[in-house]
Amino acid sequence: MTMITDSLAVVLQRRDWENPGVTQLNRLAAHPPFASWRNSEEARTDRPSQQLRSLNGEWRFAWFPAPEAVPESWLECDLPEADTVVVPSNWQMHGYDAPIYTNVTYPITVNPPFVPTENPTGCYSLTFNVDESWLQEGQTRIIFDGVNSAFHLWCNGRWVGYGQDSRLPSEFDLSAFLRAGENRLAVMVLRWSDGSYLEDQDMWRMSGIFRDVSLLHKPTTQISDFHVATRFNDDFSRAVLEAEVQMCGELRDYLRVTVSLWQGETQVASGTAPFGGEIIDERGSYADRVTLRLNVENPKLWSAEIPNLYRAVVELHTADGTLIEAEACDVGFREVRIENGLLLLNGKPLLIRGVNRHEHHPLHGQVMDEQTMVQDILLMKQNNFNAVRCSHYPNHPLWYTLCDRYGLYVVDEANIETHGMVPMNRLTDDPRWLPAMSERVTRMVQRDRNHPSVIIWSLGNESGHGANHDALYRWIKSVDPSRPVQYEGGGADTTATDIICPMYARVDEDQPFPAVPKWSIKKWLSLPGETRPLILCEYAHAMGNSLGGFAKYWQAFRQYPRLQGGFVWDWVDQSLIKYDENGNPWSAYGGDFGDTPNDRQFCMNGLVFADRTPHPALTEAKHQQQFFQFRLSGQTIEVTSEYLFRHSDNELLHWMVALDGKPLASGEVPLDVAPQGKQLIELPELPQPESAGQLWLTVRVVQPNATAWSEAGHISAWQQWRLAENLSVTLPSASHIIPQLTTSETDFCIELGNKRWQFNRQSGLLSQMWIGDEKQLLTPLRDQFTRAPLDNDIGVSEATRIDPNAWVERWKAAGHYQAEAALLQCSADTLADAVLITTAHAWQHQGKTLFISRKTYRIDGSGQMAITVDVEVASDTPHPARIGLTCQLAQVAERVNWLGLGPQENYPDRLTAACFDRWDLPLSDMYTPYVFPSENGLRCGTRELNYGSHQWRGDFQFNISRYSQQQLMETSHRHLLHAEEGTWLNIDGFHMGIGGDDSWSPSVSAEFQLSAGRYHYQLVWCQK
């Protein structure tokens, strides 16, 4: 044990937090989570241990701007200014100091290992009592599961130790410091340490004791570590559970270890042995260790699909059977290996349906509770995810247990990121930083290696490629050869990774960056000598209204076996709740706390909002990742299962044929599909309707029974096909009433019964419509070529750092947002059965014509207004965001009804999950509340739209909202939006894709850009 004078001044004088060679003082060795049961049955059933006591709850807390400002008296008693805070928590969430959101840029001046003198410091204290029996015998430990970023610990005024690495436990022996009666802990937490240079992750920078604190009492002679692994024969019919157990304390000949394996209430195998292992070298064996091997016949294998778990109980006892203590863990029989260029689980090639997940809560910051963790897992499973990457640090220890039990594959990632260094490997190639990096990797492995859900180790994130990575890669491969190692830094295919694991590589497009080229994922596989599998560690940047082009990745994954999926960036928006002057909550992002530097809304890249409400993009991910694929051939549906291990036993296939959303025929068939098998379903003769319309066949896979992760009736997969229709021509009924055209100096006015249309001759716009005396428009109907910029349109562009390549900057520079319409033509003609208005406009900016729009409005005797639009786009202007029409309707109706793709928001490059049907939703549901306002709520493939007294028919895309595109564009946060008068309608003949391969470079695929020079669309607008 390192002995240091207890005084605060002496401890601070050492400045351990600025010495990369000091990552801990007196911290105990890493190991799997312990409970020290004194009853093996309680260990088997995972009951709460009487030897494990939580110290979570109210602690006393005082904040200081620097550690030197803390008075020496704090070691002995609470300070007058101390407040009460809940542990675990981040002190920034209690109003102390400010959270800082930055992605790459370090929040402190870069001068490793030194940190600012102004180093916010939190002083925690807690008084507690210890059982008398704990003082009389054994060892009492204190466990801090997570403290950011470094801390010193005192107990009863005596210095105990020091720890850093905010995402792994720091555990200390308190036995020599405790006393009978009341005891007092004092924990000094520093916001910045040299460890902060290794924790430059894209997240909020927060501080404090943010994970659980507990006391653990272990006997003097104790289990100090245990590791379980599973081995198999070739066909997985026989297995061996290999358990290595290590003890500490007084080694006696009468000590024994028993390892028993349980499946529920049934003991499957058991073995007992004294300590003393196999001979290691010429000096002998480890006297304090023993390895037991238990044979298991026909083990039930673990996978994310079927997470079969056993329970291993490790008992330390005497030769006569007297139990000293027991530890236990869940065991999953599974094998991970790479063979022939494929990542295999239990001999089957995996397809990773993965997502990156930060530990984030809108109210609690980086504090995770079981309820939130389970909520995340259930949502992931319900949306066809089977894997999660712990980005970018080891997670709360409970997370892994839950992933074991519910079934998720885990990439466990070391808490190492040096993204802001120049070059990025400045520290990771420096041997002085090897001890700090080594602690972060080795302790992660020692804590988590018993979890079957952990199938891949990661050396960290965005830290370049240095010699330290190579050393740690070799250490892991030596200690745990049962798992592959991945690491993206330095080019995604270095010698420090078993898997090519690029981030944001595109399907077909190379990005030849200097030194670290990012090839297309297809090309990467074909590079000379490259035989590794490729799994994208990050892809499909889900920032705001995004995930366009997601289907293209999944087409490639299914086409090329060595493209084994990837991890979407990322799971949850990292917004935080703030309150306005009236106490109303609102969602905040970078800069909203006065934090500098900051990266604005770049912290919000989630498939779900911070409160776990899904983004519309989540449905697209669910659909593309679904485990059943469908093919229609004539009257036969071929259903293919992509499950590797699970036989469909809880699935019904519902099918329905509908004409324009009206059901004509339906049925259901139980699915009985073997893993990776097929089932052919013969449909009856399908009806052929006589009336015109779109005929669609829809299939949905429904789970009739609830599961551990879903309710009864859960829909897991679906597909639609448009069927051939009989040609049916419906002639419009002739009307003997002809609308009346009145011409004045300023207007053309058309009147039919109680309806009127007014066209302004100076502007050439439809300026007003009346039904009776009620005006229908608040603004004229006009062309629209822009949208409120998406995050993907903006990229990294901001006022102080313009990116001229960003879509929004190109549109601004070309004048798309400032363009004004010059009238070229406005004429009216009375036809035999209608009135025809013809207009033409040149949309210009600074004398340059960007678009020419020609329209005809044909108003007939039935009151229908048929609009045709022809647009010419200048060859030298950027491709526009949309080609459509917009106006502000006077009405505010409660509901929106449409025949088209839905029900969720969809865009041209993100619509495979949408279904063609007749949908009816509240107006409020047509708006997607992205925290950073932008274009939202589009519905594509629309044939009919009904809103209030209006109906539109044609082939178009629309969104309808209380917010104008102008307001969305000018507003920084969703809570600042205000409902405008009436309703804004945007009807597009064409709309550009949204992109999403990444959010910092233009990523809309060429096929979804509006690159043609001419466009034509038409629609009919009528009043009900």
From Swiss-Prot:
A cellular component annotation (GO) from this entry: beta-galactosidase complex
One example of a Gene Ontology biological process annotation: lactose catabolic process
Gene3D superfamilies per record: 2.70.98.10, Galactose-binding domain-like (2.60.120.260), Glycosidases (3.20.20.80), Immunoglobulins (2.60.40.10)
Keywords for this protein: Glycosidase, Hydrolase, Magnesium, Metal-binding, Sodium
GO molecular-function terms, A-Z: beta-galactosidase activity; carbohydrate binding; magnesium ion binding
Positions annotated to bind substrate: 103, 202, 462, 538-541, 605, 1000
Residues at which Mg(2+) 1 binds: 417, 419, 462
Cofactor(s) listed in the protein's UniProt record: Mg(2+); Na(+)
InterPro entries associated with the record: B-gal_small/dom_5, Bact_Beta-galactosidase, Beta-gal/glucu_dom_sf, Gal_mutarotase_sf_dom, Galactose-bd-like_sf, GH-type_carb-bd, Glyco_hydro_2, Glyco_hydro_2_AS
Keyword Hydrolase carried by entry: yes
Record-listed Na(+) binding positions: 202, 602, 605
SMART domains membership: Bgal_small_N
Positions bearing the site annotation: Transition state stabilizer: 358, 392
Catalytic activity as recorded in UniProt: Hydrolysis of terminal non-reducing beta-D-galactose residues in beta-D-galactosides
Magnesium is among the record's keywords: yes
PANTHER family named among the record's database cross-references: BETA-GALACTOSIDASE
Membership in a protein family: Belongs to the glycosyl hydrolase 2 family.
Quaternary structure (record): Homotetramer.
Protein name: Beta-galactosidase
Biological source species: Escherichia coli O139:H28 (strain E24377A / ETEC)
Classification of source organism: Bacteria, Pseudomonadati, Pseudomonadota, Gammaproteobacteria, Enterobacterales
Gene: lacZ
